[in-house]
Regions:
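A SIS-like phosphosugar-recognition module
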Residues: 1-157
Length: 157
């Protein structure tokens, strides 16, 4: 994810990591950053998720990466989450997920809908691994409510 969708990609990775108690390695990147290293670890167990922007110019670059990945496929799966109709996406993606929000939206607002896909994937993966999503880390390394953090008073200067 890029710009406003970078946060969605980051939260997607974090949620999957959290709900699978670290048994599923995750990462996020921009389409440019992904080409410079992370793409090299893709194997037949990998699901790559691409979030497409509603910005027509930006979407061209995002689709270029999806096309590149589809043509270099190594048995991995590709999911593409998008709002508007996207010609040819069904042939490129194993899981074309269209979340029709309607009119063009700012990426930040699209993210509110797009994150539901990631949360569902994380939940289903957690259950498939026999991990309880309500308490994925019973040993306490990761807690639902962060512990051990002190909130210090802040004075506006």
């Amino acid at each position: 994810g890029n710009i406003g969708l970078k946060g969605v990609a980051q939260e997607s990775a974090l949620k999957t990591l959290e709900l699978t108690a670290g048994k599923v390695a995750t990462m996020y990147d921009s389409e440019l950053g992904f080409r410079h290293g992370p793409k090299s670890i893709i194997d037949d167990n990998t699901l790559t998720v691409a979030y497409l922007s509603d910005d027509e110019y930006r979407r061209r670059y995002e689709l270029d990466l999806v096309k590149e990945m589809a043509h270099q496929r190594k048995g991995n799966k590709i999911a593409v989450v998008y709002n508007h109709d996207c010609e040819g996406i069904e042939e490129l993606a194993d899981y074309p997920i269209q979340i029709k929000v309607g009119a063009d939206m700012e990426n930040v607002l699209l993210g509110l809908d797009f994150i539901l896909f990631a949360q569902t994937i994380a939940l289903m993966k957690s259950l498939s691994l026999g991990i309880t999503p309500d308490n994925p880390c019973p040993t306490g390394e990761v807690n639902r409510v962060v512990k051990g953090v002190t909130l210090y008073p802040y004075t506006l200067k």
